Amino acid sequence: MMQFILGFTLGNVVGMYLAQNYEVPNISKKIEAFKKDVEAKKKPPE
């Protein structure tokens, strides 16, 4: 039981630390860039 509590607590502390310090990628910007890329490929070359 003690091992479970210690592991659970350590996991929570590490998770909170990573959540505060991890730079989350901006997904909406990546989607917009992907859409522009697809639109550029759809247009026939002139």
UniProtKB/Swiss-Prot annotation:
Q: Where are the transmembrane segments?
A: 7-23
Keywords tagged on the record: Immunity, Innate immunity, Membrane, Mitochondrion, Mitochondrion inner membrane, Mitochondrion outer membrane, Transmembrane, Transmembrane helix
Q: How does it sit in the membrane?
A: Single-pass membrane protein
Which terms does the UniProt entry file under GO BP?
innate immune response; mitochondrial respirasome assembly; mitochondrial respiratory chain complex III assembly; positive regulation of interleukin-1 beta production; positive regulation of NLRP3 inflammasome complex assembly
Q: Which InterPro entries match?
A: STMP1
Family of the protein in this entry: Belongs to the STMP1 family.
Q: Where in the cell does this protein reside?
A: Mitochondrion inner membrane; Mitochondrion outer membrane; Mitochondrion intermembrane space
Organism of this sequence: Danio rerio
Physiological role: Microprotein involved in mitochondrial respiratory chain complex III (ubiquinol-cytochrome c oxidoreductase) and complex IV (mitochondrial cytochrome c oxidase complex) assembly. Required for the formation of mitochondrial supercomplexes (SCs). Also required for the activation of the NLRP3 inflammasome.
Phenotype on deletion? Morpholino knockdown of the protein leads to various development defects, including smaller eye, abnormal head shape, malformations of the jaw, cardiac edema and a delayed yolk sac resorption. Most animals die by 1 week of age.
This protein is called: Short transmembrane mitochondrial protein 1
User: What Pfam families does UniProt report for this protein, alphabetically?
Assistant: DUF4535 (PF15054)
Domain of life, source organism: Eukaryota
Report the gene name. Answer: stmp1
Is Glycosyltransferase there in the keyword field?
Answer: no
**Major location (coarse):** mitochondrion
